[in-house]
Amino acid sequence: MKQFVRLGTGCVAEQKIGRQKMAIRHFLKLADFTKDELNTMLRRAAEIKALQKAGTPYVPFGGKVLVMIFEKASTRTRVSFESGFYQLGGNVIHLSSQGSQLGRSESIEDTARVVSRMCDLVMIRTFGQDRLEAFANNSRVPVINGLTDEYHPVQIMTDILTFMEHKGSIEGRTVCWVGDANNMSYSWLEAAKILGFHINLAIPEGYPLDLSLIPEGDDYYTVFRDPIEAAKGADLVTTDVWTSMGFEEENEKRRRDFANYQVNSAVMAAANPGALFMHCLPAHRGEEVTAEVIDGPQSVVWDEAENRLHAQKGIMEFCLNASSKA
């Protein structure tokens, strides 16, 4: 498994702008925030969602611009961020490596210095966390992690929002993760430590957790080799594809290694009665999950998919409101 190095940027940065200092709250990884801050984002996400469902106008982003930078392709990330920012009154610009100087020779630092002078918020979906943090370190505006190789914090906030809607607070609950030790699992581990729930991880031999990417301590998670054992006592069972972007050359090997790490009816039966099933999508039915589970009564994947829109509104509002002149 590819190993990564922990970076210590943190989510708070100060940038000098003329004679003023701007205190910037980036959203780079969950470990940068307190329990109260994450709960504030989740609460506001639920409140803003309720306003939309009621047809009540709420457009606090009028006159503001979000720049989205995609070095990794996406469906849900683009649609949810773009729709969400538009719905809150703002405007959106989409950039890709192919359609900007990032794909040629301009450094990530210089791109940040230029782009952040022309917008109010940046979302980046990229490869290494180091690229994201290099951009944030040179940005005048808040930067949101849309996904990196190491972390996927917006998705975990989405999943927790979805859990809260169906089951109430996640504090004191148990989550079961089945599959690879990937960016999703690392953000789940951060969330468990901060928000006070336990996570059981069913991960095959040869795919160890990179301990440099998770909070200290081992009281908030347990690693299993058997998905059924990991699912016992779980209130939520969740998974992801066996082969993440960037590991396509390992696809056949991973199919063999993960063959026994499928969420099926036996795994769900081992979990608590009424346990939820989630998947960040896209899903490969017959591989990491059976059609019976993902299309079954315990699955909330479509509510989960919609909640990317709402969770990210809470995150964007928090970052913009918390980033003020000091």
What are these regions (language model features)?
Residues 6-11:
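Short Gly/Ser/Thr- and charged-rich N-terminal loops/segments
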Residues 18-79, 83, 151:
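Positively charged, low-complexity intrinsically disordered leader regions
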Residues 65-66, 70-118:
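Active-site cofactor/substrate anionic-group-binding motifs, chiefly glycine-
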Residues 71-83, 167-239:
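Glycine-rich phosphate/diphosphate-binding loop of Rossmann-like nucleotide-binding domains
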Residues 113-115, 120-191, 279:
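Anion-binding alpha/beta catalytic cores of soluble intermediary-metabolism enzymes, centered on
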Residues 215-292:
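Rossmann-like adenosine-cofactor binding region
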Residues 274-275, 281-326:
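Adenosine-phosphate binding glycine-rich loop
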